[in-house]
């Protein structure tokens, strides 16, 4: 929504005042919250900052973890460009099955499936790092587009070697990888590797540019280098 496009949040918040206020805050900033669910069975999660700035999560369990597959309206993807999700809510509770339903619905309607692991942020929501890493890796092949950061490399692959790590991800549906480091931005397909100096290009702006190409998930592997450069520059 901040990039001038249409964005909708599919999730569940607590029915307490904080959850309602959060929904109103997002809606006021252009996010479509008409499909947000609310529950009285759990509260909206809260993140505090510790003395050293570390995230302290209150989630016991929280509202979004109880967001069940039957609450998701698959028809919402009929006119969607993409489904985007992170690792924060992939725990083995109803919400993981809801993600799988959303992925299937997006694919059925021809929408891109985009996965941004966001390991550094997601770690605060998981009980331990091994299960987070294993689950994140299970979801990689489900995506058409992967949106990765430098901070994802070591937690995911135990290595900072970029090409070794990223090219191993081209399995099943994965056709395009956007990778942002402190000094460069990279774009990988199965046949092309491009890079440019870090220019502040965000994953959201990258997806907006991808949308402007009017392409489809099954056409990604055939995009020529000159077309791919339009996504970076």
What are these regions (language model features)?
Residues 6-87:
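Conserved N-terminal subdomain of the carbohydrate kinase-like
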Residues 27-34, 129-155:
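Structural recognition of alpha->loop->beta junctions
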Residues 76-78, 137-140, 171:
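A short, aliphatic-rich alpha-helical micro-motif
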Residues 96-102, 127-135, 159-166:
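Charged helix-capping and loop-helix junction motifs
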Residues 106-112, 171-176:
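A short helix->loop->beta-strand "cap" motif at the edges of active sites that frequently abuts
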Residues 145-155, 164-198, 230:
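Conserved phosphate-donor
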Residues 191-233:
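Conserved post-catalytic alpha-helical subdomain immediately downstream of the catalytic base
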């Amino acid at each position: 929504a901040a990039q001038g496009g249409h964005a909708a949040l599919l999730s569940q918040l607590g029915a307490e005042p904080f959850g309602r206020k959060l929904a109103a805050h997002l809606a006021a900033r252009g996010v479509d919250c008409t499909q947000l669910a609310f529950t009285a069975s759990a509260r909206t999660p809260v993140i505090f900052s510790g003395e050293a700035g570390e995230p302290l999560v209150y989630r016991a369990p929280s509202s979004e973890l109880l967001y069940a597959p039957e609450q998701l309206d698959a028809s919402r993807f009929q006119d969607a460009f993409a489904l985007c999700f992170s690792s924060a809510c992939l725990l083995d509770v109803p919400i993981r099955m809801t993600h799988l339903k959303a992925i299937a619905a997006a694919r059925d309607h021809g929408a891109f499936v985009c996965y941004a692991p966001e390991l550094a942020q997601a770690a605060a929501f998981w009980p331990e790092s091994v299960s987070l890493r294993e689950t994140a890796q299970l979801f990689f092949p489900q995506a058409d587009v992967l949106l990765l950061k430098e901070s994802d490399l070591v937690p995911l692959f135990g290595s900072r070697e970029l090409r070794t790590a990223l090219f191993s991800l081209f399995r099943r549906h994965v056709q395009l990888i956007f990778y942002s480091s402190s000094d460069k931005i990279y774009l990988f397909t199965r046949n092309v590797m491009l890079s440019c100096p870090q220019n502040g290009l965000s994953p959201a702006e990258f997806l907006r540019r991808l949308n402007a190409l009017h392409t489809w998930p099954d056409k990604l592997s055939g995009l020529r280098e000159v077309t791919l450069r339009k996504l970076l520059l």
